[in-house]
């Protein structure tokens, strides 16, 4: 990394020293705030940390339906920058489309003599995000960036030609890094697929194919399951679970069910779920360690698990006592990909994404039950087999995190003048 020959004190705490020929300019002189309303026919936009500001229909996760008040939404033009309610976490977003967006957001038009792609990198850099966090007001869900404070802060501005050179350098380097990360992510997904295959096979075939076991098999009668060990029982969940509902424990720990992790302690400080939580939690259901919890609206996605915690969950969840099955085997089996199609099959609804699993449907789901000793043996086998896979996954994920941290540092160093991009490009060429 080549440094500039001459630096100066920027006079700005978050910047420190910058190249002598760079300018420092207050944000209020870099942007003009835009607050135009009354464009109800424009497409509704949403601000995302991953994709920038894009049409709402293109966003793959939640969609907030706006039925009225379109006149009150703010106009965003292509090339604007948008401060959303979550910008303090991931930077200010660039608008790739024209449309309208929440009136709670701040819309900024970039002034002349600034290259938008340079500002894009700057707005998403680690050092700038640290600055944003000093301008946050409110607590928890009410946190927001105070633009009155932020506009008084300053940004580093190299000459326009140098802004373009920095962007060219970063586009090349970031492209290489992103390509590497994508390849590593593919390897991680392959390992996760292998892990799921190992689990699904073990909880439906038992030890028949391992350690020279020669177990007779029989047809399960389920197309995607195929054969199961002949000595296993097939029981509907009505024989394995007992739905209960104990309330009036508002002071217990608030829990939630996440598809990938199972039952977790809900962290209200970082919760990005945006689900409404009432002040009075007396209607929430008590769940104890070892009980089975199902999010009835998302069961078809795999949002259910045996809990390792005591706490309370939403009234929209089913809470169940377990019987007959070893809880660790039941948890591993029921959360495997072998069983998710059953929950999809018994969930009903008019629109995809709003399917509801009824108590009757839940109790009709079949479960393939080995003898208790075999359940324990299968759990031990799965734990041993998946431990080695998890170790590989962890190694890949740690490598990806290191590369992502390098990417963030590279961007921050380039846009704040800590490295001479012009010299870097000359050496590369």
Locations of regions flagged by a protein language model:
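Sequence-specific dsDNA recognition surfaces
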Residues: 10-11, 28-78, 220, 238-289
């Amino acid at each position: 990394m080549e440094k500039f020959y001459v630096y100066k004190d920027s006079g700005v705490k978050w910047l420190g020293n910058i190249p002598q020929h760079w300018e420092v300019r207050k944000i209020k002189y870099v942007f003009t705030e835009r607050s135009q309303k009354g464009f109800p026919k424009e497409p509704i936009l949403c601000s995302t940390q991953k994709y920038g500001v894009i049409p709402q229909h293109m966003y793959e996760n939640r969609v907030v339906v706006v039925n009225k008040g379109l006149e009150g939404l703010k106009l965003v033009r292509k090339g604007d920058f948008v401060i959303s309610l979550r910008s303090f976490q991931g930077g200010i977003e660039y608008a790739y489309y024209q449309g309208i967006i929440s009136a709670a957001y701040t819309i900024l038009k970039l002034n002349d003599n600034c290259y938008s792609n340079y500002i894009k990198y700057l707005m998403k850099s680690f050092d700038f995000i640290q600055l944003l966090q000093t301008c946050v007001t409110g607590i928890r869900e009410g946190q927001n960036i105070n633009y009155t404070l932020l506009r008084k802060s300053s940004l580093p501005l190299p000459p326009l030609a140098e802004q373009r050179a920095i962007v060219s350098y970063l586009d090349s380097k970031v492209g290489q890094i992103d390509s590497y990360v994508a390849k590593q992510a593919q390897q991680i997904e392959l390992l996760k697929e292998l892990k799921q295959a190992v689990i699904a096979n073990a909880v439906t075939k038992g030890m028949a194919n391992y350690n020279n076991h020669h177990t007779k098999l029989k047809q399960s009668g389920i197309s995607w399951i195929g054969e199961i060990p002949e000595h296993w029982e097939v029981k509907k969940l009505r024989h394995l679970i007992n739905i209960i509902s104990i309330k009036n424990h508002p002071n217990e720990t608030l829990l939630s069910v996440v598809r990938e992790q199972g039952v977790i302690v809900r962290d209200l400080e970082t919760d990005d779920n945006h689900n409404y939580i009432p002040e009075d939690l007396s209607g929430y259901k008590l769940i104890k360690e070892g009980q089975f919890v199902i999010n009835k609206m998302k069961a078809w996605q795999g949002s259910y698990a045996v809990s390792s915690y005591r706490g309370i969950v939403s009234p929209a969840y089913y809470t169940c006592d377990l019987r007959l099955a070893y809880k660790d085997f039941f948890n591993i089996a029921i959360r495997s990909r072998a069983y998710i199609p059953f929950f999809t099959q018994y969930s009903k609804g008019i629109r995809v994404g709003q399917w509801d699993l009824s108590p009757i449907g839940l109790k009709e789901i079949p479960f393939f039950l080995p003898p208790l000793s075999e359940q324990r043996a299968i759990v031990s086998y799965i734990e041993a087999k998946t431990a080695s896979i998890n170790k590989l996954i962890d190694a890949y994920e740690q490598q990806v995190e290191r590369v992502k941290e390098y990417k963030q540092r590279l961007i921050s160093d380039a846009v704040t003048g800590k490295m001479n991009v012009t010299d870097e490009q000359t050496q590369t060429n």
